[in-house]
Amino acid sequence: MAWYDDHQAVVIAPFGLSTTDAGTLSAMTALQARYQDQVALFLLNPGLDSDRDAVAAELAANHIELPVLMDDTHLVTEMLGIGRMDEVVVYDPTSFEIAYRGPAQSGAEDAVEALLAGSDVELVSIAGTGSAIPSNESEHSELSYVNDIAPIIAENCAQCHREGGIAPFAMDSSLAVQGWSPMIREVVMTKRMPPGQIDNKVGQKIKNEMNLTDSEMQKLVRWVSAGAPVDV
């Protein structure tokens, strides 16, 4: 989000093939027409669709010119707290805080106006009534360090993150992984690690790619967010 600190607000709304809330889409289009020079506006596919060509075709068919972020792991959607298809988020890229979460028609424009005016903004949260966005978060409510996390570290990280390795620190114990867990979450979410990642959704498949699977990313990030617990 810091990449958009030259804008005074960022507005994000969920989008899915045949599941997008019509009122939300209309409100986002109106916001784009009025604020596109001052506000960054995005649609977010919360892991509902993997076919990017189909998403692009639906946008073109409906004459929508908003960019779509593909949240294949659903993790960004979770962190923004978007749970229904009619909920949008208005984000302040300077303070890194959410100013508004709720239906686009109820308060998004007011939040944008407040940010444009430079006013101090406190979070306004209004429950949406649209279709619930499915999530597998409950499947990872009791992750085991031994069975779920350590194998991912061993397979994808430990070759470099070991004593004498080329990485700046070793992941050679559960305590070390716990201590570095906030950094692990950051570099996994931003895809800086594992190094040399390739967008495997574009072009031909490439052998020996370094990417984590969506499931591995979900487990690591959700484990860290749960406090990085270790099996007793």
Model regions: which residues?
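Loop/turn elements at helix/coil->beta-strand transitions in domains of secreted/extracellular proteins
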Residues: 7-10, 36-41, 64-66, 85-86, ...
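Structural microenvironment flanking redox-active thiols in thiol-disulfide oxidoreductases
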Residues: 18-62, 72-78
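Aromatic- and Gly/Pro-enriched helix-to-coil junctions and flexible linker segments
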Residues: 123-232
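Short, internal strand/loop/helix patches
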Residues: 58-85, 89-91, 97-98
